[in-house]
Amino acid sequence: MSADLSPVDATQREIIAALHVAPVFDAAAELARRTDFLADYLRSTGLKTLVLGISGGVDSLTAGCLAQRAVEKLRAEGRDATFIAMRLPYGVQRDEAEAQAGLAVIRPDRLLTVDIRPAADAMLAALHAGGQVFRDAAHEDFVLGNIKARQRMIAQFAVAGAHDG
């Protein structure tokens, strides 16, 4: 290591060493590595299905593409494998166009849409009926946001459980 490294370079090298990451990112190699990881997981567990909620953001688009590639790889080997993408809106989502654009890129084997609004609203109503009081509307909205996240998780786990995933 050269003594004339800038502090940023030195910090970057420390981070690279501490996290054991490659100093150069090879996108094709990382794509293959992550796809193999998902395929290996299904192979080793005997499961047949990957399930993922697609929000319309970059993270779920990327993960959805990886999941679809993994099941296609397994099918090319003669294995039974499926990717189920899920839309989990709370009523009508403002970002639905972005989610649909992402789904067009992913091209999942199956798409399932489950509106979480009835379940989320029922839980909030049950909390009110049980005597839960919130500090203000913002606090209640925060709690409702957490309820929505849990309802999405419940839906995905239920679908995975129904499809060997």
Across the structure, where does each feature detected by a protein language model lie?
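ATP-dependent adenylation/nucleotidyltransferase module used to activate substrates
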Residues: 2-165
